[in-house]
A protein has these predicted regions:
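Membrane-interface helix-loop-helix junctions at boundaries between adjacent transmembrane segments
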Residues: 87-143, 148, 152-163
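Membrane-embedded alpha-helical segments of transport systems
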Residues: 12, 74-82, 107-112, 128-149, ...
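The feature identifies polytopic integral membrane transport proteins across all domains of life
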Residues: 65-72, 93-107, 124-134, 163, ...
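Transmembrane helix-boundary motif of multi-pass solute transporters/channels
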Residues: 24-38, 52, 63, 270-295
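C-terminal transmembrane helix pair
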Residues: 273-332
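Helix-loop junctions at the membrane interface of multi-pass solute transporters
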Residues: 60, 113-125, 249-253, 279-285, ...
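Structural signature of multi-pass alpha-helical membrane transport proteins
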Residues: 1-93, 149, 153-258, 326-332
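Helix-helix packing/entry segments at the starts of transmembrane helices
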Residues: 193-199, 256-272, 278-279
Length: 332
């Protein structure tokens, strides 16, 4: 019972979805169905975010260059440095491909939809999150293969215009359309914030189920032993904890407010499964792809669960701060 008090309903939903995908993964004709459903849910998420953000908020988010600069440093400098140090150290005798997999994980761009959804759930700066996460994903398509070639001795990799177009079509276009629709649906969106919050959560659950179903079908539980699996889980938790702590420290050190701190934490600590697996298919031989992306797949699940708990905690802090401000205003 104590566990259920610690974990919020959304975190329990994530665990349930992972178990569901492990025992009942999407197969056959259901695979394209869930892929299309996930795409539609993500597009709806960004449409709603565009509709509920004012023009002034978007301009302010895009112009928040100090925040964006630190998020990029966290994603493409801090993470790779930690990955290189860990791969050089090799503290445990496991398959060397697992160390390469963690190094590859650290080079990837940030995930977009969950970073923005968690920022929204926690009461952070959503406009800045949209700009930072989208920019990270777009830059990563070009920068990540270059970093792979630099630190992993893989050559002949380059960015894919098709992936750039997919990001523009699936994420930025719905956001722009939603914002352009704001004069007609803005009031309705304001009255239905709880329903929109459910849209955020549902999109994340669909991504988790679809991604983990594919991993299970590809034999994730048959490729590694329990010892290696425990190694991946522990390293993923430690890596994520280090990055989150550094991001919180730097956000406060640089003088960001609470909303911006939330954005930095959720945008600067994520790694993209959606970009990482297709990129691995291009960069690495087929025979090693499974082991290379295994740390990424497990890290992806852990980051979602950890960030769900963090989002709940930040939301409670944000609500308390707002209540204090309202109380002070009423007294004045």
């Amino acid at each position: 019972m104590k566990l259920f008090r610690i974990l919020d309903p959304f975190t329990l939903s994530l665990i349930t979805v992972v178990l569901l995908a492990s025992f009942f993964p999407a197969r056959g004709d259901f695979v394209p169905f869930f892929e299309n459903l996930t795409t539609a849910a993500i597009a709806l998420l960004f449409f709603m975010h565009g509709a509920k953000l004012s023009r002034e908020a978007i301009i302010a988010g895009g112009g928040h260059w100090r925040l964006h600069l630190w998020v990029m440093c966290s994603t493409f400098v801090l993470f790779p440095i930690l990955g290189v140090l860990f791969a050089w150290w090799k503290p445990v005798n496991v398959d060397p491909m697992l160390y390469s997999g963690f190094l590859y994980l650290c080079i990837l761009p940030a995930t977009v939809q969950s970073a923005i959804a968690f920022t929204s759930m926690a009461g952070g700066n959503v406009a800045a999150a949209v700009c930072s996460a989208s920019a990270s994903s777009l830059l990563g398509i070009f920068l990540s293969p270059l970093l792979v070639g630099l630190v992993m001795n893989v050559h002949g990799a380059g960015g894919s215009l098709e992936q750039v177009g997919k990001i523009m079509l699936q994420l930025l276009l719905p956001f722009v359309l939603g914002h352009l629709s704001r004069p007609w649906i803005g009031d309705w969106v304001s009255r239905n914030k709880k329903w929109i919050a459910k849209t955020d959560q549902t999109s994340i659950l669909l991504v988790v189920y679809t991604a983990f179903s594919e991993a299970v079908v590809n034999g994730i539980w048959h490729k590694v032993g329990w010892g290696s699996l425990l190694f991946i889980v522990v390293v993923s938790c430690v890596l994520l904890a280090i990055v989150i702590v550094i991001n919180v420290f730097m956000a406060r050190r640089l003088g960001f407010n609470k909303a911006d701190e939330i954005t930095i934490v959720f945008c600067g600590s994520k790694k993209s499964l959606a970009n990482g697996i297709p990129m691995a298919n291009i960069l690495f031989p087929t025979s090693v792809i499974g082991m290379m992306v295994l740390p990424l797949m497990i890290f992806h699940q852990i980051q979602l669960m950890v960030c769900a708990v963090l989002a709940r905690r930040y939301k409670r802090q944000t609500e308390q701060l707002q209540a204090q401000q309202e109380s002070s205003a009423n007294k004045a």
